A protein has these predicted regions:
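Alpha-helix boundary/capping motif
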Residues: 3-6, 406
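Metal-dependent amide/peptide-bond hydrolase catalytic core
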Residues: 19-24, 31, 205-214, 218-221, ...
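Acidic/His- and Gly-rich active-site-bordering loop/insert found
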Residues: 20-136, 155-164, 335
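Fold-independent oxyanion-binding glycine-rich loops
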Residues: 83, 107-109, 202-204, 232, ...
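Residue-level recognition of well-ordered beta-strand positions that form the cores
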Residues: 92, 106-108, 171, 229-233, ...
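Short pre-catalytic strand/loop immediately N-terminal to key active-site residues, enriched for Gly-Thr
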Residues: 129-140, 393-396, 437-438
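Acidic/histidine-rich catalytic neighborhood of metal-dependent amide-processing enzymes
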Residues: 133, 139-217
Length: 460
């Protein structure tokens, strides 16, 4: 059962009418939830699956839910529609000291698809069970969207102001590189971010355990992104014939080479600093322990950090043929490449050398790598804020093996950090939740995150 009210959507081409829906459960009585969990649950119930390649359910309904919540706080949000149904929300919050540089606080509203057959709950049901909120987007990243709304709401309802101007962004299309979301806004509406010099968003601020000591990872860098298509050509023919120029075989060989490639370890400034801090906590000499071994001591966070040590070339999709007994003349594969900032050209050259000249390479999408200093007033404020809420817990920098909308904002000179604070138990495999089956987030972690975020936005 849904309720609907009419709102307008402002895009580059003007305003269009659309109905916004607020999903409600028709099942058994649900547990009492605090505001952050309730908002996150509501957002999960909007299926904003982004399939890539221009295929998406769209973010419009979720965007209009957010727009209504922001208007209830007395703000004047704008909705920007890059293509039909692909909607981002931007709102500016005046700070107590508007002369200070502004801070962009942003999340994305789209999610990757989920196959209900693989889940133990409805991935878009917003189910609360075992002290956790389950559903696609519970971690990536409707949790942060909810924490943003709650933190800003708490500040404004108390009659206060954030310390500086905030630009709140709830963006479309992050899961497909942000072309229709952050990159669209940066290109077509850069004035939205006037005065802002820094940003915070996802995949940082969460806790892990190192030698039994809870520590927080602040994301201060991102690997570069290169999405390529491999295309092998051959001779079409009957499946019973001897066909040496088999496109599928040629493609399979290239895919296997890239998928098995062990790229060398490359330590960026961010990763060097991280390993030094890990070694200090473990009380070992960083020069006497291999980087791989140190990373394995970072608790569940090793799932992210291992990927930050070296380039990865992961095949993700295959397409070939149309009938069992027909050898096709073309076969294609998609490969997701993530490399260190500044190494894009060298890595592509090595990929070409690895697969040879018989397979074509088409670059589908690229985005830059980033490294931001683990120093300065914002880093100091984040560290101090976490210490107020979890005294004595170290804060460590790390390079994200994936990417965020901070890449687009960097084109405007905005320095981005990953800070969506969550205090997690030691057995919570947080990296496995991203794009995983049975994605979920602890309710108490959501409450912690909204408190920390409110504190930071009030004081920085």
């Amino acid at each position: 059962v849904t309720t609907a009210t009419s709102v307008g959507v402002s895009g580059a081409a003007g305003s269009v009418g659309r109905m916004t829906t607020t999903p409600t459960s028709t099942g058994p009585t649900e547990p009492e939830l605090d505001e952050t969990a309730r908002i996150a649950r509501d957002l999960i119930r909007f299926d904003t699956s982004n399939y890539g390649g221009g295929r998406s359910n769209g973010e419009a309904d979720a965007a209009e839910y957010v727009e209504a919540a922001l208007r209830d706080l007395g703000l004047e949000p704008q909705l920007f529609e890059s293509e039909p149904g692909r909607v981002s929300v931007i709102a500016r919050v005046e700070g107590a000291e508007p002369a200070k540089p502004g801070l962009v606080v942003h999340g994305h509203l789209d999610v990757v698809p989920a196959d209900p057959a693989n889940w133990s709950v409805d991935p878009f049901g917003g189910v609360v069970r075992d002290g956790m909120l389950w559903g696609r987007g519970a971690v990536d990243m409707k949790n942060m969207d909810a924490m943003m709304l709650t933190a800003v709401g708490d500040i404004l309802r108390a009659g206060e102001r954030p310390a500086r101007d905030l630009v709140l962004g709830f963006l479309a299309d992050e899961e497909a590189g942000g072309v229709l979301g952050s990159h669209f806004l940066v290109k077509e509406h850069p004035g939205l971010f006037d005065g802002a010099t820094e940003a915070i968003s996802e995949v940082g601020g969460y806790s892990t355990f190192i030698d039994g000591r809870r520590s927080y990872l602040l994301q201060t860098g991102e690997k570069a992104l290169i999405w390529i298509k491999l295309r092998a050509r051959g001779t079409a023919g009957h499946g019973s014939q001897m066909i040496e120029a088999n496109a599928v075989t040629r493609l399979a060989e290239a895919v296997a080479v890239l998928g098995r490639q062990q790229w060398p370890i490359v330590l960026t400034d961010t990763t060097t600093a991280l390993l030094g801090e890990v070694a200090r906590i473990l009380d070992v000499d960083v020069h006497e322990v291999a980087p791989d071994e140190l990373v394995l001591r970072t608790g569940t966070a090793k799932g992210f950090i291992r990927g930050s040590l070296r380039t990865t070339t992961n095949p993700t999709m295959l397409t070939a043929g149309y009938k069992h007994n027909v050898v096709p003349d073309t076969a294609e594969a998609l490969v997701d490449i993530r490399c260190m900032p500044g190494q894009e050209a060298a890595v592509l050259a090595e990929v070409r050398a690895l697969i040879g000249d018989d397979v074509e390479i088409e670059t589908m999408h690229t985005d830059i790598g980033l490294e931001t200093p683990f120093s300065g007033p914002l880093v100091d404020a984040i560290t101090a804020t976490l210490d107020r809420h979890d005294p004595g817990a170290p804060v460590l920098p790390y390079l994200l093996s994936g990417g965020t909308d901070n890449k687009a904002l960097s084109l405007l000179g905005i320095a981005g950090y990953g800070f969506a604070p969550l205090r997690l138990d030691e057995d919570m495999d947080f990296p496995a939740m991203f794009h995983g089956v049975d994605e979920r987030v602890p309710l108490d972690a959501l409450s912690f995150g909204s408190r920390v975020l409110r504190d930071l936005l009030s004081t920085y």
